[in-house]
């Protein structure tokens, strides 16, 4: 399989029979920061991640997969970064098309090879425990995981009548998954029922079956290493006397669980036993626990050798993040020596410099971690901290669209500070190039606001573009442009809540848009509850004034699944006119984008056309901006998310799709099988009259490879000569009146 896919995004705007589909590479717009061209600018940002090695594209080189979680939401997204440079380098490319196919995971997810087949499997959080997905990927189908264990169990009474209970794992933090006893299978270390001791669950796969392909655990030690951890400190020589060997359901259910910890297991001195790096939810540093015992009888005998400045060896920088730092023992530079990545695991910590990379410079079996950078991977992407809210406007009046980003906040000095970040277009109308100008546009950080979401429009009728911004409290602020018509923006006047209202739900996401067509810009405000408030401009063209019409405009509601997201929705609206009427995209807490048709009578309910127009969710708290940025007459999509980064999807694509007016999709009437295929594809068109069909095969960059024409409802296509990989089929189905098109992905295997 190719090392490098070009990302594909399917974006359907369906109304009056028409749907537009966007497909593009992520890097079709160049982004420059401080004179450096970013390698993966549209990689969505990173906040609080679990890091693992995984050969995602089956080229024999271990890549990096991050499971990135954002703020208070327990759902995250996998981000795949493909190792592209030689051994010893840290060059990676973003592979969004591979990121889409992982199982849905909550709280945390890490990869370890439990069955010794060379493919890392997925260990992840489930209710009070650990769930496991087996990796069954192949070069032709690289990201394919099958549920293996719904929850890992252990025998808490080994050697006698079995007493089975789940291995507890907090949803906050990550257990230690490693071969403790050096027998070739994976064991588990995790904080015990007392919350301060570490339990050891031994995997008996080797002992029972002489193979490592099972996960059969026995409870071996209630106090592995004979130490306790509490209040950001380690106490030695603990755990005496031992508790009863047999637990009953009462004291299992009554466990006082640890609030949250990350356990990183490694043999730091090459003596054959496991040492620990511990991260704690109440601490701003990690703790190092040195094992002076053996693999069979662990004894933590020194926690001061490098603590509290771990890994401050040879004057390197200590791991210190504001809240809950966790360490991950992974090979970053491909030299077959594991390095260290540290990231926070809780909201309220570093968010735009939150991936700390320590290179293992040791040439022996010991480790020597040397600090390299605190923004690994993030330095190559647009990264504005917590959340990104895109706005396209001509900031310097040169006729080219620039990019302005709002954010919930940059982590600075133990607090979050909201700012606006400006990328100016130094390219051309047809080929934008965004260059970072400032991360504190108009010095808005001085206002001490949170969750700044900008919208642009001339609300005082003086010929220049003003900014309004919503914030976390539900108020709207006005940044007045005093430059005058045709001049670069000059925002010198900040007006704090000049319109004198606060929305009924917090986190105001405003858009200036003349929804009632009276020539004045109204305020349409998305809110935390998933609704949109309509404030009509009842002032004059030169002196705006806003009156609340409704807090449930169009009856729009983008609340997520309450069992996951509670009562929140985080609506971020984008109204636009496509020539046939007003349409609405709404970003949401779940990351999906809702698409509505707005009736001419705006007092009526809007028509929900599609509750998930982006087939591939880019991350929680999506924020769409849909505008023609490359002057080709077609709208392009900028999509912000809670990770503090952006995705970009261009309209410049050969892929266009139609949908029938009656709601039955053409896609549903076309079958392609078998899929995957190793040689022949069969095409079947059902319940549809047509004169001819033309089928084209494209690779994922949009390059046409093959073409077949037919007038039959069933025909075949020979694809034996194509290399293994992912392809797109485009079917043009014609009759006398119309030509309609449909797209299908197919997987070619060897």
Model-identified regions with their sequence ranges:
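C-terminal outer-membrane/trafficking sorting elements
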Residues: 11, 19, 662-673, 677-750
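Sec-dependent N-terminal signal peptides
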Residues: 4-13
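Beta-propeller-forming repeat regions
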Residues: 20-658
């Amino acid at each position: 399989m190719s090392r490098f896919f070009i990302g594909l995004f399917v974006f359907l705007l369906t109304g009056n029979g028409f749907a537009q589909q966007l497909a593009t590479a992520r890097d079709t717009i160049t982004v420059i920061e401080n004179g450096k061209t970013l390698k993966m600018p549209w990689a969505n940002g990173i906040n609080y991640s679990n890091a693992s090695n995984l050969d995602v594209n089956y080229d024999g080189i271990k890549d990096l997969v991050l499971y990135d979680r954002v703020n208070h939401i327990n759902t995250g997204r996998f981000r795949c970064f493909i190792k592209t440079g030689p051994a010893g380098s840290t060059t990676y490319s973003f592979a969004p098309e591979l990121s889409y196919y992982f199982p849905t995971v909550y709280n945390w997810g890490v990869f370890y090879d439990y069955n010794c087949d060379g493919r890392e499997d997925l260990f992840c959080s489930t209710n009070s425990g650990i769930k496991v997905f087996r990796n069954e990927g192949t070069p032709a189908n690289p990201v394919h995981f099958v549920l293996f264990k719904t929850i890992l169990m252990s025998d808490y009474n080994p050697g006698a009548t079995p007493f089975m209970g789940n291995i507890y794992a907090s949803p906050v933090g990550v257990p230690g998954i490693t071969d403790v006893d050096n027998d070739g299978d994976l064991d588990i270390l995790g904080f015990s029922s007392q919350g301060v001791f570490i339990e050891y669950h031994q995997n008996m796969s080797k002992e029972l079956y002489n193979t490592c392909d099972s996960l059969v655990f026995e409870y071996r030690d209630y106090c592995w290493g004979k130490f306790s951890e509490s209040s950001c400190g380690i106490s030695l020589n603990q755990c005496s006397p031992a508790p009863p060997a047999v637990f009953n359901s009462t004291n299992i259910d009554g466990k006082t669980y640890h609030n949250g910890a990350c356990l990183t297991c490694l043999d730091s001195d090459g003596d054959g036993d496991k040492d620990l790096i511990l991260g704690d939810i109440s601490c701003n540093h990690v703790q190092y626990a040195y094992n002076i015992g053996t693999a069979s009888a662990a004894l933590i005998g020194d926690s001061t050798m490098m603590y509290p400045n771990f890994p401050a060896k040879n004057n390197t920088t200590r791991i210190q993040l504001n809240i809950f730092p966790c360490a991950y023992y992974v090979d970053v530079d491909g030299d077959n020596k594991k390095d260290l990545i540290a990231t926070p695991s809780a909201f309220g910590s570093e968010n735009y410099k939150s991936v700390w990379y320590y290179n293992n410079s040791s040439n022996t079996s010991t480790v020597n971690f040397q600090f390299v950078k605190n923004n690994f991977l993030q330095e190559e992407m647009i990264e504005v901290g917590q959340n990104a809210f895109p706005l396209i406007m001509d900031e310097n009046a040169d006729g080219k669209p620039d990019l302005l980003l709002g954010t919930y906040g940059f982590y600075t000095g133990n607090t979050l500070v909201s700012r606006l970040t400006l990328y100016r277009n130094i390219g051309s109308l047809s080929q934008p190039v965004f260059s970072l100008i400032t991360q504190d546009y108009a010095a808005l950080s001085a206002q001490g606001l949170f969750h700044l979401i900008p919208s642009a429009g001339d609300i005082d009728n003086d010929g220049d573009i003003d900014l309004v911004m919503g914030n976390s409290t539900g108020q709207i602020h006005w940044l007045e442009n005093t430059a005058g018509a045709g001049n670069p923006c000059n925002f010198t006047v900040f007006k704090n809540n000049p319109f004198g209202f606060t929305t009924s739900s917090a986190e105001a996401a405003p858009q200036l848009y003349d929804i009632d067509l009276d020539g004045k810009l109204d305020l349409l405000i998305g809110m935390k509850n998933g609704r949109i408030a309509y404030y009509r401009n009842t002032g004059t063209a030169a002196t705006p004034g806003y009156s609340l019409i409704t807090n449930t405009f169009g009856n729009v509601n983008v609340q997520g699944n309450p069992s996951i997201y509670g009562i929140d929705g985080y609506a971020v609206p984008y109204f636009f006119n496509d020539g046939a009427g007003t349409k609405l995209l709404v970003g949401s807490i779940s990351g999906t984008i809702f698409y509505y048709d707005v009736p001419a009578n705006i007092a009526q309910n809007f028509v929900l056309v599609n509750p998930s127009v982006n087939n591939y969710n880019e991350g929680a708290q999506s924020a769409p901006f849909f505008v023609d940025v490359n002057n080709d007459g077609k709208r392009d999509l900028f999509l912000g998310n809670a990770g503090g980064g952006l995705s970009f999807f261009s309209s410049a694509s050969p892929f266009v799709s139609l949908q029938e007016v009656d709601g039955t999709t053409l896609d549903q009437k076309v079958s392609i099988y078998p899929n995957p295929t190793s040689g022949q594809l069969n095409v079947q068109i059902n319940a549809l009259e047509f004169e001819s069909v033309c089928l084209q095969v494209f690779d994922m960059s949009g390059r046409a490879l093959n073409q077949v024409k037919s007038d039959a409802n069933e025909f075949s296509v020979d694809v034996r000569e194509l290399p293994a990989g992912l392809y797109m089929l485009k079917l043009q189905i014609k009759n006398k009146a119309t030509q309609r098109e449909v797209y299908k992905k197919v997987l070619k295997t060897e």
